[in-house]
């Protein structure tokens, strides 16, 4: 009996083994078949996305709604992080090309070059993505979906993150943001190179220290005429892949749970159908009770906040709210059909980037020398010549036996890179740029260079060598490189010192220690060229009156030093224009937390600023003439002649005043075109003005209406009044 029993057990075990092997084989076959199915590039994108969705479990679906998507190995879907940065080059992902910050890019008024630049950013991103995939690395910052551009309005010069934006004007911001989106989202053979995200929707521009609890209270007029136009323009003119909602509240409601903002306006009115993503951990501000950081506290629980966001149109959370999302689903606060709709959009986005193809698209290595050339070109075009007394610039090296280069930003390579940046292989500081240029000159024309930082940006005392005064006295010219630093202004910084708080500025003046140093040098009777590095406007009243030349060089990226030297010595004719107003210390600026637009920016200022929006000098002169309007084609024309002796670029700017709107802007930019004009030659610039500029906002009805009346147009020193 015992022997028979063993034999029967062996027989059963053998059958069981065969059954298990058979089941495993079937499962493996199904998995392989499923993987083959989702990797069929011939199927329509929508069909493939739906097929994958149908294979997912609920937990797998929910996992895709957090920015760190876990892998679904049984279907061959790799892990992926949606959080990647490319504000002015691929960021936080090792060595990469660092282009100028967005305020500097805006100063070029060259959206064509900005689009080319972001096309190169997409190329570099693909290169890095391909390498990460090969290495099995799926961390944050290694992907293709970029939380850029920042198209908030730089409404106040004190905002620390203003340097991430394209300035204070809605139309300039819209054009530059469009260039960024189209550059990143180049489409080849049906696949996007990368995906852009316009942020922060909406009405988001400080204060940084209070951003997790701040309520931006704005009128309908300010909302619709200043804060929303750039978003609307990009949604209407591009296929932008993502929109990010901001941390702040808008008129009492957190942006990421704001149905009026996200559903009524963005989705229903404008027809946006891309992905909605939260700012990182923004939903936590809705429910967390924090004794250290004040928060909105608008929802009782994390699940309630998740339901308010995902139960509406938010598809993806940058954060760690998966448990709350799951709880909201289990409580019946979010229907499964809505989860399916969100995940379907997420899958379509990944498929549109070619992420699930057997062979990754765009896997060839581009010519990276083009990236370096473009970084230099953009830095050169961004520099704004603010003052040039007695045409001291361009410098003639043979006139100077020795030149002193001093100031806290003279040899600071980190400053050049701004924030949200990559690590350049080599950043040329302004000191290095000047030294390098001088060393190319014949020995008999080569001035000696003396260098010292001389002072800090803000705090501390002078740390001068004993022979500092003698060295300056022996020099024929001083180049002072000062201004601000991303260590002082930026996103939610832990900075508390004179003139700075939490990443924002409390004063628009140049830090006192730098002005004191300039006054000390001025007393020595030396000509001074001041190179300002900053993310935005600085009040330079004393400097404008007392110094010989002023340049705004922004945070100019890895090639800033070379670009500044090229402008100082005349290799490049400066052509940048201010994307922000440079206020005088005499100008009134409303309280920082007031989001209404009266007295703000060139559009609503009635006082004279120190340097106006759109201002910038050149080493040549331009004459405007024959300003005309073709009523049939609705086009404006203007002739521009280079009357100087040097070739140069000019930015023709068209401004409009709506005389039917008593509360409207004093003037507003409605067109611009950057043109190259050789010495002595003339070009004709053509402007096509968007018809929406001819609509008047009616406060009584909280909407725009087309009302006939007079409109004043200006281009250079030319103007005309038209009845439309």
Question: How would you name each of these model-derived features?
Answer:
Residues 31-696, 700-721:
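Glycoside hydrolase catalytic-domain context in secreted enzymes
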Residues 1-36:
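Bacterial Sec-dependent N-terminal signal peptides
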């Amino acid at each position: 009996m015992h022997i028979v029993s063993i034999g029967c057990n062996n027989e059963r075990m053998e059958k069981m083994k065969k059954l298990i092997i058979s089941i495993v084989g079937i499962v493996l076959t199904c998995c392989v078949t499923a993987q083959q199915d989702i990797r069929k590039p011939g199927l329509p994108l929508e069909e493939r996305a739906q097929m994958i969705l149908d294979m997912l479990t609920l937990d797998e679906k929910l996992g895709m709604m957090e920015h760190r998507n876990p892998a679904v190995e049984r279907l061959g879907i790799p892990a992926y992080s949606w959080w990647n940065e490319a504000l002015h080059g691929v960021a936080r992902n090792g060595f990469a090309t660092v282009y100028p910050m967005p305020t500097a890019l805006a100063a070029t008024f060259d959206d064509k070059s900005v689009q080319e630049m972001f096309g190169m950013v997409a190329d570099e991103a693909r290169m890095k993505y391909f390498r990460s995939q090969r290495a099995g690395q799926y961390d944050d910052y290694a992907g293709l979906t970029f939380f850029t551009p920042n198209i908030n309005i730089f409404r106040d010069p004190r905002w620390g993150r203003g340097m991430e934006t394209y300035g204070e004007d809605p139309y300039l911001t819209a054009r530059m943001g469009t260039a960024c989106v189209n550059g990143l989202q180049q489409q080849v053979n049906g696949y996007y190179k990368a995906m852009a995200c316009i942020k922060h929707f909406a009405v988001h521009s400080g204060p940084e220290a209070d951003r997790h609890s701040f309520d931006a209270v704005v009128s309908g007029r300010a909302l619709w005429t200043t804060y929303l136009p750039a978003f609307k323009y990009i949604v209407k003119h591009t296929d932008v892949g993502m929109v990010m909602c901001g941390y702040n509240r808008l008129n009492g409601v957190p942006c990421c749970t704001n149905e009026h903002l996200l559903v009524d306006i963005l989705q229903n009115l404008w027809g946006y159908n891309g992905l909605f993503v939260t700012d990182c951990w923004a939903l936590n501000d809705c429910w967390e009770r924090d004794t250290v950081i004040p928060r909105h506290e608008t929802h009782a629980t994390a699940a309630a906040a998740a339901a308010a966001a995902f139960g509406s149109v938010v598809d993806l959370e940058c954060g760690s709210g998966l448990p709350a999302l799951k709880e909201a689903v289990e409580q019946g606060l979010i229907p499964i059909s809505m989860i399916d709709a969100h995940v379907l959009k997420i899958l379509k986005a990944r498929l549109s980037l070619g992420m699930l193809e057997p062979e990754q698209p765009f896997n060839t290595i581009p010519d990276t020398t083009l990236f370096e050339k473009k970084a230099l070109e953009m830095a050169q075009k961004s520099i704004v010549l603010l003052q040039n007394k007695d045409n001291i610039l361009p410098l003639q090296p043979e006139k100077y036996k020795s030149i002193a280069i001093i100031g806290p930003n003279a040899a600071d390579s980190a400053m050049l890179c701004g924030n949200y940046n990559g690590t350049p292989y080599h950043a040329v500081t302004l000191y290095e740029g000047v030294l390098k240029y001088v060393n190319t000159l014949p020995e008999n024309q080569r001035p000696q260079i003396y260098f010292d930082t001389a002072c800090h940006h803000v705090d501390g005392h002078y740390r001068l060598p004993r022979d500092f005064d003698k060295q300056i006295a022996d020099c024929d010219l001083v180049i002072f490189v000062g201004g601000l630093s991303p260590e002082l202004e930026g996103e939610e910084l832990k900075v508390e010192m004179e003139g700075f708080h939490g990443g924002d500025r409390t004063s628009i003046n140049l830090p006192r220690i730098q002005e004191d140093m300039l006054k000390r040098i001025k007393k020595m009777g030396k000509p001074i060229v001041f190179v300002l590095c900053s993310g935005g406007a600085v009040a330079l009243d004393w400097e404008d009156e007392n110094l010989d030349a002023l340049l705004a060089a922004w945070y100019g990226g890895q090639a800033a030093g070379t670009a500044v030297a090229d402008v100082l010595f005349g290799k490049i004719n400066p052509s940048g224009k201010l994307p922000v107003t440079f206020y005088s210390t005499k100008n009134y600026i409303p309280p920082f937390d007031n989001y209404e637009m009266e007295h703000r920016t060139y559009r609503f200022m009635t006082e004279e600023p120190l340097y106006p929006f759109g201002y910038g000098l050149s080493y040549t002169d331009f004459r405007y003439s024959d300003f005309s309007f073709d009523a049939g084609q609705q086009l404006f024309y203007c002739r521009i002649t280079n009357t100087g002796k040097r070739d140069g670029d000019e930015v023709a700017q068209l401004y409009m005043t709506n005389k039917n709107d008593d509360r409207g802007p004093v003037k507003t930019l409605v067109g611009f075109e950057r043109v190259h004009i050789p010495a002595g030659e003339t070009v004709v610039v053509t402007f096509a003005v968007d018809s929406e500029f001819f609509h008047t906002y009616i406060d009584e009805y909280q909407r725009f209406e087309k009302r006939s009346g007079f409109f004043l147009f200006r281009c250079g020193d030319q103007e005309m009044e038209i009845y439309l």
